[in-house]
């Protein structure tokens, strides 16, 4: 058996994407994502197509729950993007950025996300939240002073929403990283559609 090279692992998913699903429901899901994104997403072809439909519906449910959050859509995407950057999930970085482009959000702010702590595009409240997100994601622990600084800017509900975003983004990140799923170049597709 051949051992995969580093290049092969970077380019190919660990499981071969299923291009033609068997079930009628999954064929419909493929068609809907092709319509929504301009292509069938790799996580769908690699993971969801191999699992009972309810598992794919769970990922969809996360997106629906995000719409019930009181945080601004920009803050939601900034948090998700930041977690994806820390975890190095190329697919999640790409899809998050494509959502930001589609919503005409400030791309310069997303470009500056790695320097949020010093960049004037970010408010003190955003910096406090992103410091919290950084510690929670990277260290799996948060210092009391980091929490206190964040809680000066956010309600208890908003704090719980921030924790939800970090936890649910980990689900997406680990699912994609675990199957070697990389960028689907969704930003390019989104920019062409605008």
Where are these regions (language model features)?
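Hydrophobic alpha-helical segments
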Residues: 1-194
């Amino acid at each position: 058996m051949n051992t995969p090279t580093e290049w092969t692992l970077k380019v190919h998913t660990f499981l071969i994407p299923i291009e033609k699903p068997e079930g009628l429901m999954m064929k419909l899901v493929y068609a809907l994502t092709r319509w929504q994104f301009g292509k069938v997403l790799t996580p769908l072809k690699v993971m969801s197509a191999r699992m009972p439909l309810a598992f794919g519906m769970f990922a969809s449910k996360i997106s629906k729950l995000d719409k019930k959050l009181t945080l601004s859509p920009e803050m939601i995407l900034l948090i998700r993007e930041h977690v994806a950057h820390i975890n190095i999930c190329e697919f999640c970085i790409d899809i998050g950025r494509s959502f930001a482009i589609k919503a005409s959000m400030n791309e310069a702010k997303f470009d500056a996300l790695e320097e949020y702590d010093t960049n004037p595009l970010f408010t003190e409240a955003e910096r406090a939240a992103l410091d919290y997100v950084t510690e929670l994601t990277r260290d799996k622990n948060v210092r009391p002073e980091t929490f206190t600084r964040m809680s000066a800017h956010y309600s208890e509900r908003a704090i719980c929403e921030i924790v939800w975003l970090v936890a649910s983004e980990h689900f997406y990140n680990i699912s994609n990283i675990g199957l070697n799923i990389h960028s689907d170049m969704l930003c390019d597709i989104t920019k062409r559609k605008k």
